[in-house]
UniProtKB/Swiss-Prot annotation:
Family: Belongs to the Ycf3 family.
Main localization, broad class: plastid
PROSITE patterns recorded: TPR, TPR_REGION
Official protein name in the record: Photosystem I assembly protein Ycf3
UniProt key word Plastid: yes
Keywords for the protein's UniProt record, in alphabetical order: Chloroplast, Membrane, Photosynthesis, Plastid, Repeat, Thylakoid, TPR repeat
Entries under HAMAP family matching the protein: Ycf3
Species of provenance: Oltmannsiellopsis viridis
Recorded topology in the membrane: Peripheral membrane protein
GO biological process, one term: photosynthesis
Source taxonomy: Eukaryota, Viridiplantae, Chlorophyta, Ulvophyceae, Oltmannsiellopsidales
Length: 166
């Protein structure tokens, strides 16, 4: 049974009903409707921490979705799951793919910066100050672009940048 038919709480049920109505009335192909259904089920599974199920749904959505903009969000969400699982290298691959399709995705830029910042912190712990500087520089570049696209969204990043560049 699809996840969308297993929702237990009122908000999820309401969202599912509204989404189903929209999918039925919007002039889209069956393929696009299927892609959206998989994407929606992936988001629901991801929200519940069911990452394996979410990935299965996202990969099915990717198989069906042809619009680059819509694909960017699927790829971004796959990156989020890999980030949550500590697989930062794989997460970066998906964030980069998302940005190739949608360069105006500040949340992907932010998450890339967070990973580089984390790696910079790890390099400091290992006594690799030169490597940490390179990683922090990369983080700064990605945060600057994220902030340029969404100036009010990344206040912690702005604070870090102010300290890092001064």
């Amino acid at each position: 049974m699809p996840r969308s038919q297993r929702n237990d709480n009122f908000i999820d049920k309401t969202f599912t009903v509204v989404a189903d109505i929209l999918v039925k009335v919007l002039p889209t192909s069956n393929r696009e409707k299927q892609a959206f259904t998989y994407y929606r089920d992936g988001m629901a599974a991801q929200a519940e921490g069911e990452y394996a199920e979410a990935l299965q749904n996202y990969y099915q959505a990717l198989r069906l979705e042809i619009d680059p903009y819509d694909r960017s969000y699927i790829l971004y969400n796959i990156g989020l799951i890999y980030t949550c699982n500590g697989e930062h290298g794989r997460a970066l691959e998906y964030y980069y793919q998302a940005l190739e399709r949608n360069p105006s995705l500040p949340q992907a830029l932010n998450n890339i910066a967070v990973i580089y910042h984390y790696r910079g912190e790890q390099a400091i712990e290992r006594g690799q100050s030169e490597i940490s500087k390179l990683l922090f520089d990369k983080a700064a570049d990605y945060w600057k672009e994220a902030i340029r696209l969404a100036p009010t969204n990344y206040l912690e990043a702005q604070s870090w940048l102010n300290q890092y560049t001064n």
